Amino acid sequence: PGGILVLQNGSTGLFYGYVVKISQSEKDQVQITAYDQTWYLKKNKETYVFTGKRADQIVKQIAEDFKLKTGTLANTGYAIPSMIEDGQTLFDIALKAIDLTLINTGKMFVLWDDFGSLAITDVETAKLDLFVGDGSLATGYTYDQDIDSDTYNKIKLVKDNKTTGKRDV
């Protein structure tokens, strides 16, 4: 734990995160749990008062305050007149700013971790040319969601190992 996990498709970065848990079964299957920077947004709480700031400016300030890396933060266009958040998670603060932008402009943005950098992208332009299954090296995945820890994206890629007859994670 504590190491860096990187997933790439050729030279395109897909996931950059930090290993927080490693498990091994009696069948020598290894499971690695890693989180990107959005995990830090959910784990930290703060109090903020914003006046006349856009959602992208709010995310930039949060990232600077908590020394998180940022990438492309699309100009969300809408200056939020006033937003007061007391003891809220950084993730909830950022999402409220994005929600207020949607409510007031009809434009939808997504906050995500773009290979180790927080990013805000207009959903109209967000698309990933990637597939999982036949013709790719990744033939399966697991997506978990639960009410207790639904705070991050968790992806588990597995590949059939023809040499060992097992699946490699």
Can you annotate each of these PLM segments?
Residues 76-84:
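Surface-exposed aromatic
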Residues 2-70, 74:
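Surface-exposed cap/loop segments at beta↔alpha junctions
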Residues 95, 106-169:
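Acidic, small/polar-enriched beta strand-loop surface segments
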Residues 67-75, 101-116:
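Short, well-structured beta-strand/strand-turn elements
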Residues 90-104:
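Long, contiguous amphipathic alpha-helices that act as assembly "spine/axial" helices in icosahedral shell
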Residues 56-60, 91-95, 154-155:
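Extracytoplasmic/secreted envelope proteins and their assembly/folding machinery
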Residues 25, 78, 126-127:
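Solvent-exposed loop/turn segments at secondary-structure junctions
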